[in-house]
């Protein structure tokens, strides 16, 4: 699945879309099916495993130098929080590069990437975990669960830079409701499994 967040640090801030794969397999799909018109900048913890976080720049923005510092901080915090090692550290270095600078070949493991040019890579420091920022972002999260690769493929065919902005805006309510139903189903299944386990334990005790 793929997660979509909205970075809007203040009431009057211009909203930015942040995208992140749930795991290394979805991260590979984002690398494979993204396209230049999306204008993505990629964030990843330096020297540690972490989430692959993408920030969508606006059409008139070329680099992170054009982005409000508060929005960059949101991306840094989200990336650091999705690193097991980095999340425990008081400070963590984050690698930043445009999506089109990522290199992926068939010999690499899922989640592994290299770069076409190190000159296009930058590093920024992220401080200690900021729960205020992370809680704000979590409230905006929308989950694309079904037909992920097909949807990414459809987007790439259009070459529309605003495909996912429009998609999330049009389908937000349905996607949120679908996620709620999945959580309920998962909770019910967990209860059912526990009941089955308890019944087996009771049967074993009776046999003894």
Curated annotation (Swiss-Prot):
The gene is JLP2. Keywords: Cytoplasm. Belongs to the CCDC25 family. The keyword Phosphoprotein does not apply. This is Protein JLP2. InterPro entries: Jlp2/Ccd25, NFACT_RNA-bd. PANTHER family: COILED-COIL DOMAIN-CONTAINING PROTEIN 25, DUF814-RELATED. It is found in: Cytoplasm. Present with 3060 molecules/cell in log phase SD medium. One of its GO terms (cellular component) is cytoplasm. It comes from the Eukaryota. Residues 185-208 are annotated as: Disordered. The keyword Cytoplasm applies. Residues 185-194 have a biased composition (Basic residues).
